Design a protein with these regions (language model features):
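Alpha-helical transmembrane segments
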Residues: 1-27, 57-95, 126-147, 165-365
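Membrane-interface loops
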Residues: 23-40
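Juxtamembrane helix-capping/reentrant segments at transmembrane boundaries
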Residues: 36-50, 105-118
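Short, amphipathic alpha-helical segments
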Residues: 83, 104-115, 140, 161-164
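Short loop/hinge segments at the start of secondary-structure elements
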Residues: 93, 108, 114-118, 122-129
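Membrane interface segments of multi-pass transport proteins and intramembrane proteases
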Residues: 101-111, 148-157, 310-312
């Protein structure tokens, strides 16, 4: 418990007090936000605002995890390192994307295929390590089963060592790509992705701590125990990321003095996916990350409807004034802060529903 609290406190203090230094540095090197001309007019004032703030978020979380574990004289588990690897790895993909945007002053950084490739490399490496890094008893951080609140009977590795491994890797890649892109899409208004990510990842601090107290590895006689490796360390990492986000939000709230950029959104989405995979709650991501599902769904609906109507009538039509959904409400005249707070409320309800499902499953299992 001390490690959970300490990690969150260290990360919060780091981003709260160090982010101004990053703002100054990014202004000096010219890492400012590029704003599309066809976007909402209110966004034009954001041009030049320092971006790549995800560096501060990720660095704060990593330092906090290592600092908390070192202070308490505890080793860092493979599971914790895997989540940090995912966050740093996808953060690096986002950094390259951000760097190209700021250096060339355009809205397109990495091409779509290049970003998919980068996400794929990190996801595949994570999947292989999560399956192969076994302890003395043969337990690995991840399993080959699809999970909801715990592992189901759908074991992908049952298809054989080769086909099964390929299926697991593809499944993990899908989760990582969907989650990281979902957070990335939500990062369109000051503080929206920061606050929403803090709530969603915070759910895994609660889940990890609960799994630790009900762990089969601590006492196999516990009713409805969880076969999750290093669940307490997963809670520590989640707490560190949440602390880092809260400190960053002080500077990212409207009017934002710094943006997280793709460095932050892809890294945070990766951390969220990794926590879900290692806590064996993969499909619980749908309610916990419900806000990200909604905004991503709005983009998919917009594109599909436009292409269908263009194919049928020759003229593409749109469901929303603009996608993602938060921009639709901007164009309808809502204030940005109103949209952000209301979306936070939706995100909070989604997180509460997900955590509620997790607890109810344990209660009635």
């Amino acid at each position: 418990v001390k490690s959970i609290i300490l990690a969150g406190a260290i990360a919060l203090a780091f981003t709260l007090f160090a982010t101004p230094a990053f703002i100054w540095l990014f202004k000096r090197v010219g890492w400012g936000q590029f704003v599309r001309e066809d976007g909402p007019k209110s966004h034009h004032t954001k041009r030049g605002t320092p971006t790549m703030g995800g560096i501060a978020i990720i660095l704060g979380a990593v330092l906090a995890v290592f600092g908390a574990k070192l202070f308490n004289g505890e080793p860092i588990s493979n599971s914790a390192l895997l989540v940090l690897f995912m966050m740093v790895g996808l953060g690096l993909v986002g950094f390259i994307d951000d760097f190209i945007k700021t250096h060339r002053q355009r809205s397109l950084g990495l091409s779509g295929w290049a970003k998919i490739f980068g996400q794929g490399v990190v996801a595949v490496a994570f999947a292989v390590m999560a399956l192969q890094l076994k302890d003395a008893d043969g337990w690995s951080p991840a399993s080959g089963s699809i999970s909801v609140v715990r592992d189901t009977n759908i074991d992908l590795l049952a298809w054989g060592p080769v086909v099964g491994l390929i299926l697991v890797v593809l499944w993990i890649y899908f989760l990582v790509a969907a989650t990281s892109n979902g957070v990335n899409i939500a990062d369109g208004l000051d503080g929206l992705a920061t606050g929403s990510s803090a709530m969603a990842i915070g759910a895994y601090a609660v889940i990890g701590f609960w799994q630790f107290n009900q762990s089969c590895f601590r006492d196999p006689l516990i009713q409805n125990c969880y076969e999750v490796k290093d669940s307490l360390d997963l809670a520590v990492v989640a707490s560190a990321v949440v602390g880092s986000l809260i400190g960053f939000l002080w500077w990212n709230t409207s009017p934002a003095q710094i943006f997280m950029g793709d460095t932050g959104s892809l890294g945070l989405g990766g951390a969220l996916a990794a926590l879900a995979i290692l806590t064996r709650t993969e499909l619980l991501l749908i309610p916990i990350g419900g806000l990200f599902v909604i905004v991503t769904g709005s983009v998919i609906i917009q594109r599909v409807y436009f292409k269908l109507t263009k194919w049928k009538t020759g003229t593409g039509k749109r469901v929303f004034l603009m996608s993602p959904l938060h921009h639709h409400f901007e164009l309808k005249g809502w204030e940005q802060i109103t949209i952000v707070v209301r979306f936070w409320l939706i995100g909070a309800l989604c997180v509460l529903s997900g955590v509620g499902m997790f607890y109810l499953e344990w209660t009635y299992a």
